[in-house]
């Protein structure tokens, strides 16, 4: 899981609008995306 977070932050650091988000904001966004993905994969 740690490697996943490293890839996530490396990828998002290159996106200008995500670069300005703090680490907690990016974690919150990631959690929301993962929940959304879980809901979509169940249906």
From Swiss-Prot:
The keyword Transport applies. This is Putative inhibitor of glucose uptake transporter SgrT. Keywords: Phosphotransferase system, Sugar transport, Transport. GO terms for biological process: negative regulation of D-glucose import; phosphoenolpyruvate-dependent sugar phosphotransferase system. It holds the Pfam family SgrT. Entirely encoded within the transcript for the small RNA sgrS. It comes from Escherichia coli (strain K12). Acts to promote recovery from glucose-phosphate stress due to intracellular accumulation of glucose-6-phosphate caused by disruption of glycolytic flux or in the presence of (toxic) non-metabolizable glucose phosphate analogs. It may do so by inhibiting the transporter activity for glucose uptake (PtsG) as cells that overexpress this protein do not seem to import glucose although they have nearly wild-type levels of PtsG. Induction: By (toxic) non-metabolizable glucose phosphate analogs under the control of SgrR (at protein level). It comes from the Bacteria. The gene is sgrT. InterPro entries: SgrT. One of its GO terms (molecular function) is enzyme inhibitor activity.
């Amino acid at each position: 899981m740690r490697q996943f977070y490293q890839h996530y932050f490396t990828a998002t650091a290159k996106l200008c609008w995500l670069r300005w988000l703090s680490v907690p904001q990016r974690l919150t966004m990631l959690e929301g995306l993962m929940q959304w993905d879980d809901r979509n994969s169940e249906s």
